[in-house]
């Protein structure tokens, strides 16, 4: 079985699983296949971008844990792609892995709603929520077509604000942020992020919460070593899936809402890059095993990342330049001035909460039965993780853990 078709995980990128849901009324099979093709997204491109950005963040924060949400970033960039033209549009399409992200967004937002069951499990409520919004400086007029796509495909309403009143503008956006992440991320904007040229801010929030699908993990009473210089108490459990390639081993552990956490342990000790782990190949691996024993620490950390420089190195430098063409967005020439993302992760023996908010600010230019094979994956030194949607091959969160302090 192709594991990429079933894959839902976490790694300071947290995500869920299954093949996309399509509903087409009175359509022939050929028409249905064509419609699916129009909204296909290149998951290999998406995964590699996730890896590149997570490695870039880790390079900038070498002593810290980092987590990043590809899904949140892609929805924010997907909105501005709908108003881009020419070279700017081509660059965004290439990064997003599709020429019609709006259609993908509409489809995947419906999938996300199916995970938001509100079921209670070990003190956690099963939730997966995504939200988008447009914050428009008074005096800027959005193009009708852009505003319609934002509302129809991203469910993003436009609110007019006076950006010269920086404090009120930030308070309004932050209140939205707090509400849509259930208080996990109470703030994304600060007044010094706005200037006299700021005209538009597009925000996306992603919130995940769920208990584990099986019994809670066991928690040790004694501390053990993590890496070479730290100690922590560990959780242990039986995993659902085991993966292995030449660079890493991994376990997958499902949540109650069918999303999953994937813990990835490099075979080589010491620091590592996610790119070197061949995560795509790892998740397609089908090693023989009968049981996988999992061991990992509880996690609680947050990441704040200005992504402009890293994105500029991935082929998106045009969107930040005066050559950017976003004439389909508004009646003024604008370009992206900053891309900020905040993420937070809380993971314990009963379940997980994870949230991300991305703010894009724009301004004017200028197997058969055999003897049991038991595998162990013990995250007792630096490791990577994913929160993944297996069914839709969507990486919700990706992360790298270097410390338990």
Ranges and model annotations:
Residues 341-343, 348-405:
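C-terminal soluble interaction/assembly domains
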Residues 35-97, 206-211, 386-388, 395-402:
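His/Glu-rich zincin catalytic helix
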Residues 1-2:
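N-terminal secretory signal peptides that target proteins for export/translocation
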Residues 66-75, 129-130, 198-201, 383:
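Alpha-helical scaffolds flanking conserved acidic
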Residues 5-17:
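Sec-dependent N-terminal signal peptides
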Residues 17-34:
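Sec-dependent signal peptide cleavage junction
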Residues 266-288:
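Internal alpha/beta scaffold segment
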Residues 29-34, 63, 101-267, 287-370:
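Non-catalytic, conformational "gating/processing" segments within enzyme and secreted inhibitor domains
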